[in-house]
Amino acid sequence: MSNYAPADPRASSNRYRYNGTCMTNPSERFDNLVGSDQSFEQLRRATFGEQPEEGIVLTTLDNAVNWIRKNSIWPMTFGLACCAIEMMSMGASRFDIARFGAEVFRPSPRQSDLMIIAGRVSQKMAPVIRHLYLQMPEPKWVISMGACATSGGVFNNYALVQGVNQYIPVDIYVPGCPPRPEQLIYAITLLQEKIQAERGSFRRALNLEPVTP
């Protein structure tokens, strides 16, 4: 299921309390690692009581792998039109995407795990986008940024694709023309939540399970 970033991300501004790159509350950091599975919650309470001992974390390999992946997202250096300007602003000092571990923009799809479709997609560009997507290693994710990438926007004509999801799967949609950098940052946090909730990550990392194309 794809998530849809709201137009005003300020509604969730209190959801996380970051100090640099870490949550300020140790118990919140612990809960984020172990996930919400009730069996692990019961095991934690039976072992440590209400508050875990300092420096001890109870988790699974899946949750550990997901935690590492969600905090080390490498977007591709890739822009199509106007929305790419807002994407570049996201990487500058004012918005500082480095707080979320996603400041490493890579020029090669083989070294990236996030593609941000920032701008309208022409019929000639769509096969190129799909080719770049197929070159990205697993696991990989896609954010559709702006009205044009999502549905064609104001360009409703034969030359443009009416939604990039016709060519590649999309994980997060960001509305706006163009969206503000805060909205794209909120989309990154939604993607991090989706990554953390994935199951079977460790087995797929060891090629023990087939990956759905």
From Swiss-Prot:
One Gene Ontology CC term in the entry: respiratory chain complex I
Origin: domain of life: Bacteria
Gene Ontology MF, one: NADH dehydrogenase (ubiquinone) activity
Cofactor note: Binds 1 [4Fe-4S] cluster.
Top EC class, one word: translocase
Function, as annotated: NDH-1 shuttles electrons from NADH, via FMN and iron-sulfur (Fe-S) centers, to quinones in the respiratory chain. The immediate electron acceptor for the enzyme in this species is believed to be ubiquinone. Couples the redox reaction to proton translocation (for every two electrons transferred, four hydrogen ions are translocated across the cytoplasmic membrane), and thus conserves the redox energy in a proton gradient.
UniProt subunit comment: NDH-1 is composed of 14 different subunits. Subunits NuoB, C, D, E, F, and G constitute the peripheral sector of the complex.
Name used for this protein in its record: NADH-quinone oxidoreductase subunit B 1
Organism: Koribacter versatilis (strain Ellin345)
